[in-house]
Amino acid sequence: MESKEQHLIRQYFILAMFFLFLAGCAQKRSLETTTYENWKTHLAEQSIWQVEGKLAFISPDERQSANLNWQQSQNNNNLVLTTFIGTRILSLKQTANTAELNYDGEQYFDTNATALLKRLTGFALPVNNADSWLKGTIDDQTLKVDQLGRAKSVLWFDSTGKKWQIEYASFVQKSGYWLPSRLTLTHQKIKIKIQLYDWQFN
């Protein structure tokens, strides 16, 4: 049986460990808050990135799904869509002045990637502005954010004048940023659901 002195020492030890645990939690929350205060500005400045994911295009007449690989390097934007067994559906490149689409064995050119994609495939996707809406750093007066400043929803016009409702369902934290992992774009009766993973930055 332990003595009264041993019992008190043990109680003090338990209390000390408890307070150390609380202090560690408080420090962790403080570090997370510090990271949050700057993450959105830094993320908006990141112009070189790559992300993989899945995409579902839903309209009243059809539903199509694909894997996506999306890359941006400065002003160059490159989107590749493949089937779930890896067969390439299309690749779309946008530079400062030119858009190039490889689709169905043919090569097409325009000045606007969003318009080119819609004209030849019927697939509406605001490719030109992906650097902002895909990362969730879009800046618009209709933007709604959560308590951490992450985008929740926005009503926004793309480069061709189409109005989109974008809903951000979930985020993942990586490299000090909150990055969208699930989002939905809606234009009239067209809905595009996107799941993103494996964000990479250079």
From Swiss-Prot:
Residues 1-24 form the signal peptide. A lipid is attached at residue 25 (S-diacylglycerol cysteine). It is found in: Cell outer membrane. GO terms for biological process: lipoprotein localization to outer membrane; protein transport. The keyword DNA-binding does not apply. It comes from the Bacteria. The keyword S-adenosyl-L-methionine does not apply. A lipid is attached at residue 25 (N-palmitoyl cysteine). One of its GO terms (cellular component) is cell outer membrane. PROSITE patterns: PROKAR_LIPOPROTEIN (PS51257). It is a lipid-anchor. Keywords: Cell outer membrane, Chaperone, Lipoprotein, Membrane, Palmitate, Protein transport, Signal, Transport. Monomer. Belongs to the LolB family. Plays a critical role in the incorporation of lipoproteins in the outer membrane after they are released by the LolA protein. This is Outer-membrane lipoprotein LolB.
